UniProtKB/Swiss-Prot annotation:
Top-level taxonomic group: Eukaryota
Encoding gene (name): Ap3m2
Keyword entries, A-Z: Cytoplasmic vesicle, Golgi apparatus, Membrane, Protein transport, Transport
Record note on quaternary structure: Adaptor protein complex 3 (AP-3) is a heterotetramer composed of two large adaptins (delta-type subunit AP3D1 and beta-type subunit AP3B1 or AP3B2), a medium adaptin (mu-type subunit AP3M1 or AP3M2) and a small adaptin (sigma-type subunit APS1 or AP3S2). AP-3 associates with the BLOC-1 complex.
Pfam families: Adap_comp_sub, Clat_adaptor_s
Transmembrane parts of this sequence: none
High-level lineage: Eukaryota, Metazoa, Chordata, Craniata, Vertebrata
The protein's name in its UniProt record: AP-3 complex subunit mu-2
CC annotations in GO: AP-3 adaptor complex; axon cytoplasm; clathrin adaptor complex; cytoplasmic vesicle membrane; early endosome; GABA-ergic synapse; glutamatergic synapse; Golgi apparatus
Biological function: Component of the adaptor complexes which link clathrin to receptors in coated vesicles. Clathrin-associated protein complexes are believed to interact with the cytoplasmic tails of membrane proteins, leading to their selection and concentration. Ap47 is a subunit of the plasma membrane adaptor. In concert with the BLOC-1 complex, AP-3 is required to target cargos into vesicles assembled at cell bodies for delivery into neurites and nerve terminals.
GO biological process per UniProt: anterograde axonal transport; anterograde synaptic vesicle transport; clathrin-coated vesicle cargo loading, AP-3-mediated; intracellular protein transport; intracellular transport; synaptic vesicle coating; synaptic vesicle endocytosis; synaptic vesicle recycling
UniProt membrane topology term: Peripheral membrane protein
Length: 418
């Protein structure tokens, strides 16, 4: 299946490679570099690239390309999902997944990759099992290993490897028993210049941090589970219970994990939390243009919109911009023609605005179309789809755990046409 794995930074340098079968020459990545040059952005590189003797499958996360090399046809999503699992494992082990961190922990990285694949086929991909096989690096363990010459490889077989719940090790004990769940929704939308919604959808996840003693059995119920589409679960979830009762029943892994991901595509269920009033005008035979935008809240259930950043790619004919923001700071790059306005929080009583003039090339024709406006924002304690957790119950253990639910909505690809 997977012959080799190459890690490539955004500059095109291969800084780590791992081979499970025969060694594949680095020259195979030349096909990937050619595709990278053709793509305008890193995210636009094709995930599957055929070559005369191999297939290259890649994911781009944390400014790193994870490129798998295979020689036989396999389901592409199978390989791509494994690559995402590799990234998540690195993040779980080291806190962050970045080029410097991977280089600093290169021995542990190779040990983890050796356990995750056996002769090119996925073997141990659960973080709990991997942490028993390969101990996560700590300052103390690094010092001890340096002095004694030992490694991070565990000296015992994982207790959960052969059990019916391989994602959870046995004998887990905590002084404070707690279970926290984060409902995070990302809204993608296109708004036309009249303010009507062209398309809108929500991608959501529920991330969990569970630190419970023993072998607890949890059930999580929702107030309105029917609005969830295209749901994908962690293997711990009992699917038949969800199909029949729309209740999540599971024995959780120990620590951090993603319980489920879901999709809300019905546009009548997608509320648009912000609006943009805009007035952008270019005149023929004039060296000046007018620019004015105002951002305000809409359908936020009284929650504050924060972390607002407005960006817009201006036409090539714009030489400079003289703008005044009512709040926040703005920048305009005359080379890339990119306007960026860091708004911060939106106060409903005093809506933020950015207005002024644009300097245009003398004699240049009027642009064919106005620029689009892209928004970034986040709203704490709000799931924009209306999803709400009803209750969390625990069975199989007698103690009473601490429980908490947190909601957050953030912008994905949120575009306003002008």
């Amino acid at each position: 299946m997977i012959h080799s794995l190459f890690l490539i930074n955004s500059s095109g340098d291969i800084f780590l490679e791992k081979h499970w079968k025969s060694v594949v020459s680095r020259s195979v990545c030349d096909y990937f570099f050619e595709a990278q040059e053709r793509a305008t952005e890193a995210e636009n590189v094709p995930p599957v690239i055929p070559t005369p003797h191999h297939y290259l499958l890649s994911v781009y996360r944390h400014k790193i390309f994870f490129v798998a090399v295979i020689q036989t046809e396999v389901p592409p999503l199978f390989v791509i999902e494994f690559l995402h699992r590799v990234v998540d494992t690195f993040q779980d082990y080291f806190g962050v997944c970045s080029e410097p961190v991977i280089k600093d922990n290169v021995v542990v990285v190779y040990e983890v990759l050796e356990e995750m694949l056996d002769n090119g086929f996925p073997l141990a991909t659960e973080s709990n099992i991997l942490k028993e096989l390969i101990k996560p690096p700590t300052i103390l363990r690094t010092v001890v290993n340096t002095i004694t010459g030992s490694t991070n490889v565990g000296d015992q077989l994982p207790t959960g490897q052969l059990s019916v719940v391989p994602w959870r090790r046995t004998g887990v004990k905590y002084t404070n028993n707690e279970a926290y769940f984060d409902v995070v929704e990302e809204i993608d939308a296109i708004i036309d210049k009249s303010g009507s919604t062209v398309t809108a959808e929500i991608q959501g996840v529920i991330d969990a941090c569970v630190k419970l003693t023993g072998m607890p059995d949890l059930t999580l119920s929702f107030m309105n589970p029917r609005l969830l589409d295209d749901v994908s679960f962690h293997p711990c979830v009992r699917f038949k219970r969800w199909e029949s009762e729309r209740i999540l029943s599971f024995i959780p892994p120990d620590g951090n994990f993603r319980l489920l991901a879901y999709h809300v595509s019905a546009q009548n269920l997608v509320a648009i939390p912000v609006y943009v009033k805009h007035s952008i005008s270019f005149r023929d035979s004039s060296s000046l243009g007018r620019f004015e935008i105002t951002v305000g809240p809409k359908q936020t259930m009284g929650k504050t919109i924060e972390g607002v950043i407005v960006t817009s790619q201006m036409p090539k004919g714009v030489l400079n911009m003289s703008l005044t923001p009512s709040q926040g700071t703005h920048t305009f790059d005359p080379v890339t023609k990119m306007l960026s306005w860091d708004v911060g929080k939106i106060n409903p009583q005093k809506l933020p605005s950015l207005k002024g003039t644009m300097g245009l090339q003398v004699g240049a024709s009027k642009p064919d179309e106005n620029p689009t406006i892209n928004l970034q924002f986040k709203i704490q304690q709000l799931a924009i789809s209306g999803l709400k957790v009803n209750r969390l119950d625990m069975y199989g253990e007698k103690y009473k755990p601490f429980k908490g639910i947190k909601y957050m909505t953030k912008a994905g690809k949120f575009q306003v046409r002008t």
